[in-house]
From Swiss-Prot:
Identification of the protein by name: Large ribosomal subunit protein eL40
Molecular function GO labels: structural constituent of ribosome
Family: Belongs to the eukaryotic ribosomal protein eL40 family.
Coiled-coil spans in chain: none
UniProt xrefs under HAMAP family: Ribosomal_eL40 (MF_00788)
Underlying gene: rpl40e
Length: 48
């Protein structure tokens, strides 16, 4: 996807809240905005 490993980590090494779609650190267990525990990693491959 990205040309550089550093750029790829910066773009995709985050978790997304399933409730409010906020970006969170990869080590997060709860959302920083709403406190929801349902987090997923950002998709590395395009859909479709």
């Amino acid at each position: 996807m990205a040309r550089f490993e550093e750029a790829e980590n910066r773009m995709f090494n985050v978790k997304i809240c399933l409730k409010c779609n906020a970006r969170n650190p990869a080590a997060a267990t709860t959302c920083r905005k709403c406190g929801y525990t349902g987090l997923r990693f950002k998709a590395k491959e395009p859909r479709g």
